[in-house]
Curated annotation (Swiss-Prot):
Residues 150-200 have a biased composition (Gly residues). The gene is infB. This is Translation initiation factor IF-2. Belongs to the TRAFAC class translation factor GTPase superfamily. Classic translation factor GTPase family. IF-2 subfamily. Residues 347-516 form the tr-type G domain. The lineage of its organism: Bacteria, Pseudomonadati, Spirochaetota, Spirochaetia, Leptospirales. Residues 356-363 are annotated as: G1.
Length: 852
């Protein structure tokens, strides 16, 4: 035993070169499992020098996991185990901090692992040291490695703490000799191409490593028993690329023809002339992004809210095997009219609109007629909204509309003129004709309704009715007393003078007009005003123009729908029904409709909602695709289309100039351009800037606005765009006349001049299957051109008039055949040729007509 100890001591002393003293505890192999006692003390030997690197104990197959683990000395004949006690190094190595040793102990069977034993560097501290050393200690016979603490003979590795004899690896903490796991090699070398130590004993993967490998999704090395698979960095890149390829194939796989709900694209869809991208995607059961992508490939940069035409939608749908049926959005918004039985018509009360200049007494007149005060409800003398009232007289009912007289409410007055039957024009006898008076006249004339003039305030000393009659006669309102057709009534609303006569004149005018309606049909009317009431919700004043409205009826009001929950008369009393010419307040609307919007009762609430939805879509899209002459206004550019449709018999113009004289000169020049086909009518002319009331008058009468040395402000321009009214600006009078003249010349039917260029006689008929009959002809005069029109004449009677389909000379197609040559002629749409008939070729020249 002493010889063995001597051999070990000499070996250790030969390796000492730093002069450091370490304390080694030398044990025999047979004593490693024996417990220490006072009877058998340990034998200790102090070495004069030791390796710089503290030696890590190896686990022994036969120990219990708590006793020190020994390693045989290189030159000893028998195995001995040694252990180095933890001591501080000299000042030259004081900056080095040792790493925690995490060697795992594994049972010989390999079925499970022992708990990690305490590191000898911890002393009695329970905290595990996790920081790496700032300076790597020198190791005897080290294997190649990077940032790893390994024992003698250890293989290369990267950031892994392994026991002696372990193969190289990559970021793995494994027991001695372990070879499995990503990058673990048998006795291999790590980065740096350093030689590794001998391979350790094959060890199974611990349960912790298996869980870590599964969590990372790594395939690791080969899991076959006894087989090691080497994996290089190239292999890892290939693996990562394969995973990415698989991911992108799943993420961006080819789009199937299925929608967001899993429903396949329908074989046919119905769209409007213009459709939103999002709505098209919804109809085709596709994601909006797919539709947008297809449109971008077609060169269209769109978003989900952009609108495309039906042709583009059809091209896109065709790629998915879907057919598109185009329907008119405008037609979807129209409610079919009921057919009335003539026996159901009855006389209805007249609807009267009171117009006039502010403070001329129109509200006082209505108050006197109704015998109830409404003046207290006004603010600043201006009526806040259009009121509708019905009054009883000795001869019948009369419905009154009170339109505001101030310029700010001109648009509402225009709507009032559209629903009225008779206009009462109130003019103060002591004031005369004012600008608002002329505006009221223009609106009434545009609505083509009769005007009854009420000269008010005749009780005042300064009243001059004759002056008023003269001024109005200059504007086309000549009284019956002076040989005209306008009825005048002199009244005093404050003194109740002439009121009964005025009512009598109104009813007399209504009898002349023979106003009738059918109370047995569904109600149809117009929204006079609408508001949001905090207690009742949306409330609309409706003037029923035909039919009868009852509580519970579903309806459509503008773009909104609803069901009548309750109805009130003009006195605020609940009513069950409202007949023709009756104003009623209606609740139960799902929105606040605009004044002037149409009101229609429906048989079914579902149908009402559908029409409401179509009108909302139409409002979003605008007038695109709507029928010409129904929604868009007349412009100088589209007048020709209107005249072709027969929708324009008269071109209406509003003239505004800087001075009155210029306006009159332009008016006289334009009125001379009228023709029997199209009449030019200047409905209003005056001096001053173009204002909102001019735009609303143009909208109500479908007219153009001509500005001479005047402009419209931005607010008025925005209103004109909303109402689709065209405003044209000029600085020279003849420019106005010339442009209007050119526009009207475009309305004139062009003159067509026909010129016969050749005739041919049919001498033989050739019947060709699948083609038809071909006439063998001899050109007798002029020439026959393939592009010419032809007519077939038999016995002086024209049998057919059309176009040539083919022209042949022998077997060749030719463009023309001159006199004296034979040819074969096929006429498009005609086969009933007879020998002896004449084919006449002619051209038509279109000459544009001009105004004289």
């Amino acid at each position: 035993m002493e010889d063995k100890n001597k051999t070990i001591k000499e070996t250790l002393q030969g390796a000492a070169d730093a002069g450091k003293r370490k304390k080694l505890i030398i044990k025999k192999k047979g004593d490693e499992n024996s417990a220490p006692s006072s009877a058998s003390p340990k034998k200790e030997t102090i070495a004069e020098s030791a390796p710089v690197k503290p030696l890590t104990p190896l686990p022994s197959r036969g120990d219990s996991g708590q006793s020190p683990i020994v390693r045989p000395a290189p030159s000893a004949s028998k195995e001995v185990k040694y252990e180095e006690s933890s001591r501080k190094q000299d000042s030259g190595q004081s900056g080095s901090r040792p790493l925690r040793d995490k060697d795992s102990q594994v049972r010989p069977s390999g079925d499970s692992s022992y708990p990690v034993s305490r590191s000898p560097f911890q002393k009695e501290d329970s905290n595990i040291i996790v920081s790496r050393p700032t300076q790597r200690p020198v190791r005897p016979n080290p294997g190649g490695s990077y940032q790893g603490n390994r024992g003698p003979g250890q293989g290369g590795g990267y950031q892994g703490n392994r026991g002696p004899g372990q193969g190289g690896g990559y970021q793995g903490n494994r027991g001695p000799g372990q070879q499995t796991g990503p990058g673990n090699r048998f006795g291999g070398s790590g980065p740096g191409n350093r030689s590794g130590g001998p391979g350790g004993r094959p060890m199974p993967i611990t349960s912790a490593e298996v869980e870590l490998s599964q969590a990372r999704g790594s395939t690791g090395a080969s899991k076959k028993k006894g087989h090691d698979k080497e994996k290089t960095s190239s292999d890892k890149r290939d693996f990562s690329g394969a995973e990415n390829t698989k991911f992108f194939k799943q993420r961006f796989k080819k789009t199937k023809v299925v929608g967001v709900s899993g429903v396949s694209v329908p074989k046919e869809i119905t769209v409007l002339e213009n459709v939103q991208v999002g709505e098209l995607a919804k109809k085709m059961n596709l994601k909006p992004g797919d539709v947008i992508g297809k449109l971008m490939k077609m060169g269209m940069m769109v978003t989900i809210n952009n609108i495309i035409d039906a042709e583009t939608a059809a091209l896109l749908a065709d790629e998915y095997g879907c057919k598109v049926k185009v329907v008119s959005l405008y037609e979807e918004t129209i409610i079919e009219e009921e057919k009335d039985n003539e026996g159901d018509y009855i006389n209805r009360p007249p609807v009267v609109t009171i117009m006039g200049h502010v403070d001329h007494g129109k509200t006082k007149l209505l108050d006197t007629i109704r015998r109830s005060s409404v003046i207290d409800t006004e603010s600043g003398g201006i009526t806040q909204h259009i009121g509708a009232y019905q009054v009883k007289t000795a001869r019948g009912l009369i419905t009154f509309l009170d339109t505001p007289g101030h310029e700010a409410f001109t648009s509402m007055r225009a709507r009032g003129a559209k629903v009225t039957d008779i206009v009462i024009l109130v003019v103060a006898a002591d004031d005369g004709v004012m600008p608002q008076t002329l505006e009221a006249i223009s609106h009434a004339k545009a609505a083509e309704v009769p005007i009854i003039v009420a000269i008010n305030k005749i009780d005042l000393p300064t009243a001059n009715p004759d002056k008023i009659m003269q001024e109005l006669a200059n504007h086309g309102l000549q009284s019956e007393e002076w040989g005209g057709q306008t009825m005048y009534v002199k009244i005093s609303a404050r003194e109740n003078i002439g009121i009964d006569k005025l009512l009598e004149v109104i009813l007399l005018q209504a009898e002349v007009m023979d106003l009738k309606a059918n109370p047995k049909r569904k109600a149809k009317g117009t929204i006079i005003e609408a508001k949001l009431d905090p207690g009742r919700g949306s409330v609309a004043t409706v003037l029923i123009q035909n039919g009868t409205l009852r509580v519970g009826d579903p309806f459509v009001a503008g773009v909104f729908s609803g069901r009548v929950r309750a109805m009130y008369n003009d006195l605020g009393q609940l009513i069950e029904e409202a007949g023709p010419a009756f104003p009623a307040q209606v609740t139960g609307i799902d929105g606040v409709p605009d004044a002037g919007a149409p009101f229609d009762a429906m048989a079914d609430e579902k149908e009402a909602r559908n029409i409401s939805q179509h009108r909302i879509e139409f409002e979003k899209i605008g007038n695109a695709g709507a029928a010409a002459g129904t929604t868009s206004k007349v412009t100088l550019e589209n007048m020709n289309e209107y005249i072709k449709l027969g929708a324009l018999k008269e071109l209406k113009v509003i003239i505004k100039a800087d001075v009155r004289g210029s306006a009159e000169a332009i008016k006289e020049s334009l009125e001379k351009l009228s023709t029997p086909e199209v009449k030019l009518n200047v409905i209003q002319s005056g001096a001053g800037a173009i204002v909102d009331m001019d735009v609303m008058l143009a909208s109500a009468s479908n007219a153009l606005i001509i500005g001479f040395h005047v402009r419209a402000n931005p607010k008025t321009i925005a209103l004109a765009e909303k109402e689709q009214v065209q405003i044209k600006y000029y600085n020279i009078i003849y420019q106005v006349v010339d442009e209007i003249k050119l526009a009207m010349e475009g309305l004139l039917e062009p003159e067509k001049i026909e010129e016969v260029i050749g005739t041919a006689e049919i001498r033989e008929i050739f019947k060709v299957s699948k083609i038809g009959n071909i006439a063998g002809c001899m050109v007798t005069s002029g020439k026959i051109q393939k592009s010419a029109n032809v007519r077939v004449i038999s016995d002086g009677v024209t049998k057919f008039d059309g176009k040539l389909k083919s022209l042949k000379r022998v077997k060749d197609d030719v463009n023309d055949v001159v006199s004296g040559f034979e040819c074969g002629i096929q006429v498009d749409g005609y086969n009933d040729f007879k020998v002896g008939d004449t084919i006449e070729a002619y051209n038509v020249t279109v000459i544009k007509r001009k105004l004289e």
